[in-house]
């Protein structure tokens, strides 16, 4: 008889909680086929997505923010009131990275996804390249 692992069950039971807009302070994600991980803050409602990383002066090593939407669509990010240089990855509903862009501090110019995205992941600029993470890599919720 097949029994899913506890990690599998926990991971998939947590997804509805995340997408329903219930607040979670931080969540650990990893990237399939790698040993790379991030601890991310979750922005899963309009208020949290609007605030994003505004007024954040520093990001610790291997941290970021994961923006979640209920449906896939064109997503746009900006850097208003954000002093950090960031990279943003737009991800599919399955968690696959589709596009990665560098973001200029304090820029109010929108950087939009070309492909429909259900998630966006912001990290320190250069984190993706430094860790060998790119288009096609998939996140895993731990």
Feature names for model-found ranges:
Residues 2-16:
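Bacterial N-terminal signal peptides that target proteins for export
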Residues 4-5, 19, 43, 93:
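A general, composition-driven signal for non-globular sequence regions
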Residues 15-25:
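Hydrophobic h-region of N-terminal signal peptides that target proteins for export
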Residues 24-142:
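Compact, glycine-rich, soluble single-domain proteins
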């Amino acid at each position: 008889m097949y029994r899913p692992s506890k990690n599998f069950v926990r991971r998939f039971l947590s997804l509805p909680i995340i997408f329903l807009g219930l607040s979670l302070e931080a969540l650990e994600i990893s990237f399939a086929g790698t040993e790379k991980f991030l601890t991310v803050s979750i922005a899963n409602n309009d208020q949290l997505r609007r605030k994003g990383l505004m007024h954040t002066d520093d990001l610790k090593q291997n941290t970021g923010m994961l923006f979640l939407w209920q449906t896939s669509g064109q997503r746009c990010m900006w850097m208003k009131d954000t002093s950090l240089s960031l990279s943003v990855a737009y991800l599919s509903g399955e968690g696959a990275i589709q596009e990665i862009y560098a973001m200029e501090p304090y820029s109010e110019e929108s950087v939009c996804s070309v492909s429909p995205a259900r998630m966006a992941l912001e990290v320190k600029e250069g984190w993706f390249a430094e860790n060998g993470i790119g288009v096609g890599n998939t996140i895993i919720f731990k």
